[in-house]
Amino acid sequence: MEWAEWINQCFHIGNLTLPLVAITGFIMGLVITIQSYPSMAAFGAESWLPSVVSVSLVREIVPVITALICAGKIGSGIGAELGSMKVTEQIDAMEVSGTNPYNYLVVTRILATTLMVPMLVVISDTIALYGAYLGVNMKQDVSFSLYMHQIFQKLTFNDVLPSITKSFFFGFAIGAIGCYKGFITRNGTQGVGSAANSAVVLSTFVVFLIDLVAAQLADIFSIT
């Protein structure tokens, strides 16, 4: 295991995606709250707004949107980087020099995405809840302590567990697909662009597929 390269990839992924994930998380929390308020107010259920929005954000919206951002930023980057190394024969040169390209390039990137995507989801969840608090305060005068109390009345470990668990699978899939598309790149620079594009498309599809499977498993095992 190339630990130095793995740590480097973790920092690279964090620096590449954290600002976008943080901003998107805040906006998601704010927008979902603003859009949910009229429907809940129509039924006189405004007091349930923090609870409903927090569960929706943590269980479904934030993990999926964060994974899609990572698929676009990280998946395409890995596909393009390894594709470029493939067409310029840098990977062949690594094999000739005695370096295992799969350990150095593939394993480190897959493990980095598998670790970092859940961490980004947790960060985005936290920021999204602050965005939701701003949205609630635009409609109601609610103290932060009361807001947090209302959130954790309904938001439980059974909401957080499926979210974090499927995020590990999102990260693994994004890294594995990016590496696979990069390693099978052909046809020079045109192939590099195709590798990056196909990595994003396939990663996006797999993210939704994993999310569907996770939802079904949560329902089967009554993690609701």
Regions found by a protein language model. Name each.
Residues 82-107, 189-192:
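Short cytoplasmic-facing helical segments at TM-TM junctions of multi-pass membrane proteins
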Residues 35-58, 126-168, 176-196, 218-224:
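Membrane-interfacial helix-loop-helix connectors in multipass membrane proteins
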Residues 196-214, 218-224:
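Helical hairpin unit composed of two closely spaced alpha helices linked by a short loop
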Residues 9-65, 69:
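Active-site cofactor/substrate anionic-group-binding motifs, chiefly glycine-
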Residues 15-27, 62-67, 115-124, 161, ...:
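Hydrophobic alpha-helical transmembrane segments of multipass membrane transporters and ion channels
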Residues 49-92, 120, 177:
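Hydrophobic alpha-helical transmembrane segments of multi-pass membrane transport proteins
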Residues 100-121, 195, 199:
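Start (N-cap) of specific transmembrane helices in multi-pass transporter permeases
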Residues 1-16, 187, 221:
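N-terminal, non-cleaved signal-anchor transmembrane helix
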